[in-house]
């Protein structure tokens, strides 16, 4: 509202929930989450957890919708104890992973809304003697550089930030 009041041109990176009337560019993260559920299902996983960021952020809301769409498409039931939100840091990801893996029916795969949270799973898996990629599958979203140095490297949907920046600049000009 302030930018509009001052007639300052702007664009948004990401959609808003209130459908603000302004130019925006977004990458459809919800499609990635749906595809991730489908991929995990194709590998034999039926109990797939979702670790989300803060649900008040629109990207987190959309990624949750993609996860739920994937479950529904495959005939899998949502289990409330397999969906955690408010996970913003690697330490939060560690705590969320530990909670999920201590459930009476733990997931065999975990989908993370952000790479930062997913990186926390590596410590927990090591502590519990689980091999990521063999005994626990992980897919995440963002493509942060640190993911390439995890062992094994983090499976992630990499965001082309250069392309996003170019699109935003084109919208602004």
Language-model region placement:
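Flexible loop/hinge segments that line or gate small-molecule binding clefts
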Residues: 1-35, 116, 142-154
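Alpha-helical structural signal in soluble globular domains
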Residues: 2, 6, 62-74, 99, ...
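Short beta-strand elements in bilobed, periplasmic/extracellular small-molecule ligand-binding domains
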Residues: 20, 68-94
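Hydrophobic alpha-helical segments within soluble ligand-binding/sensing domains
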Residues: 25-50, 65, 69, 90-99, ...
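Alpha-helix capping/helix-boundary segments
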Residues: 56, 63, 116-118
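Flexible loop/turn connectors
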Residues: 96-173
């Amino acid at each position: 509202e302030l930018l509009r009041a001052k007639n300052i041109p702007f664009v948004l990176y990401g959609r808003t929930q209130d459908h603000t009337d302004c130019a925006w560019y977004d990458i459809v993260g919800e499609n990635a989450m749906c595809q991730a559920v489908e991929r995990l299902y194709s590998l034999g996983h039926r109990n797939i957890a979702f670790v989300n960021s803060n649900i008040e952020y629109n990207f987190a809301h959309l990624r949750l919708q993609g996860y739920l769409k994937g479950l529904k498409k495959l005939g899998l039931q949502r289990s409330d104890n397999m969906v955690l939100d408010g996970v913003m840091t690697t330490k939060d990801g560690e705590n969320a992973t530990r909670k999920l893996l201590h459930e009476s029916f733990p997931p065999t795969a975990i989908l993370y809304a952000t790479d930062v949270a997913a990186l926390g799973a590596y410590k927990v898996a090591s502590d519990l003697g689980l091999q990521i990629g063999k005994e626990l599958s992980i897919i995440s979203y963002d493509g942060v550089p640190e993911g390439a140095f995890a062992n094994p490297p983090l499976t992630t949907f990499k965001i082309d930030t250069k392309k996003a920046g170019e699109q935003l600049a084109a919208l602004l000009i």
